[in-house]
Amino acid sequence: MAAESLPFTLETVSSWELEAWYEDLQEVLSSDEIGGTYISSPGNEEEESKTFTTLDPASLAWLTEEPGPTEVTRTSQSPRSPDSSQSSMAQEEEEEEQGRTRKRKQSGQCPARPGKQRMKEKEQENERKVAQLAEENERLKQEIERLTREVETTRRALIDRMVSLHQA
């Protein structure tokens, strides 16, 4: 198994990024507590016939590598008793997940691919920093050239003055 790079750097992480990671973790953990979760892997046809509930697409997004929308299908529904309290609890959980998704959409993050979105934002931020540092570098070069010219003129003036004092 090949080692994968971390989806983040070891630098300081912004609070909104930490909050998004925390929400993603909560979604994954809560889906694990609900029932046996099943993520189909290639060449696993015999296990696909088992009864599992599937994860919310937002919680699966960080697991997928290929671009495009995440497709999650329900292979079969877990049996529910006619007890209304269980069905109302399931509805409440679904509403909570939808609320979290809406909250994330409102904060400007894409729930379908939060890891890739963060990486893209980080890359854009790094490009802005590079451009900003290049501008600062150019400004500093010009300042160095200006100061070098100023030192040269001051040095010449000082030499001329010393020469004129010795001649007098």
Curated annotation (Swiss-Prot):
InterPro entries: bZIP, bZIP_sf, DNA_damage_induc_transcript_3. It is found in: Cytoplasm; Nucleus. Residues 133-147 are annotated as: Leucine-zipper. Residues 100-129 are annotated as: Basic motif. GO terms for molecular function: cAMP response element binding protein binding; DNA binding; DNA-binding transcription activator activity, RNA polymerase II-specific; DNA-binding transcription factor activity; leucine zipper domain binding; protein heterodimerization activity; protein homodimerization activity; RNA polymerase II cis-regulatory region sequence-specific DNA binding. Its main location: cytoplasm. Belongs to the bZIP family. This is DNA damage-inducible transcript 3 protein. It comes from Mus musculus (Mouse). The gene is Ddit3.
